[in-house]
């Protein structure tokens, strides 16, 4: 009798495992698997949902998320950034920038050659200036920039002498980038970020996509400074932002 019960329990567990895994990827954008060179950046699912006044940014990939980082070069110019990115239709004004100045995206990044979160000590060693390799979050504003390449996106530069509206946690770089300190979490193939909003309605009406990409820092500050140079994967395949929050 006991053996029969154990078999029944085991059978139920086996049947429930695929269902649970499938439920993890309900809604959002389901992406084609196996079309990225690096499995930790091969997107299989992207989703944004809201819980009260908090937005949950979710991305699942086909291998352990966050397990691959750029190789340090020892120099800022020419150094690389790896990123998990959620481009959205959210107005850039909602997070502290001017209104509608480009594509507002949440990005989780790693870059061992520089630190751009001067308010935070991600590795807990007491030094605020050596944490670039630790995965961390940014708001970035993106626009097509021909100086990055034909049809290529770059982080929007701040022209010399300009004083645009900027978030209070702007790190001082001459680009539309914020370092708000929302810690990403990694759990096997999933990376997530929880972001509080004063007006969650700005998120709940938004559309979104998912991108994994490499960026490169240029030698000249306004060359532009930071360009997308390697799009590893796009959830929709065409950056059409088909995702809808809470769907």
What are these regions (language model features)?
Residues 16-18:
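N-terminal signal peptide c-region/cleavage motif recognized by signal peptidases
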Residues 143-196:
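Short helix-loop boundary/capping segments
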Residues 88-92, 205-247:
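Acidic/polar low-complexity flexible segments
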Residues 38-143:
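Surface-exposed, glycine/proline- and aromatic-rich loop segments on solvent-exposed faces
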Residues 25-36:
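Intrinsically disordered, low-complexity eukaryotic regions enriched in glycine, serine
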Residues 1-7:
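Bacterial N-terminal signal peptides that target proteins for export
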């Amino acid at each position: 009798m006991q053996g029969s019960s154990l078999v029944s329990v085991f059978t139920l567990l086996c049947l429930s495992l695929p269902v649970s895994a499938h439920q993890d990827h309900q809604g959002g954008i389901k992406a084609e698997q196996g079309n990225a060179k690096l499995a930790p950046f091969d997107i299989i699912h992207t989703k944004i949902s809201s819980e009260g006044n908090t937005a949950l940014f979710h991305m699942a990939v086909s291998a352990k998320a966050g397990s691959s980082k750029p190789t340090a070069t020892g120099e800022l110019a020419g150094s690389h950034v790896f990123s998990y990115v959620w481009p959205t239709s959210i107005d850039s004004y909602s997070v502290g920038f001017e209104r509608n100045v480009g594509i507002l995206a949440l990005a989780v990044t790693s870059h061992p050659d520089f630190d751009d979160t001067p308010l935070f000590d991600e590795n807990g060693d007491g030094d605020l200036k050596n944490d670039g390799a630790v995965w961390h979050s940014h708001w970035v504003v993106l626009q097509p920039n021909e100086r990055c390449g034909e049809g290529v996106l770059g982080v929007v530069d701040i022209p010399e002498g300009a004083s645009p509206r900027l978030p209070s946690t702007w790190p001082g770089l001459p680009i539309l980038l914020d370092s708000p300190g929302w810690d990403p979490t990694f759990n096997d193939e999933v990376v997530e970020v929880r972001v509080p909003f004063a007006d969650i309605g700005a998120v709940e009406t938004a559309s979104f996509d998912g991108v994994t990409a490499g960026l490169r820092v240029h030698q000249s500050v306004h060359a532009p400074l930071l360009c997308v140079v390697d799009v590893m994967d796009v959830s929709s395949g065409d950056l059409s932002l088909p995702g809808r929050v809470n769907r």
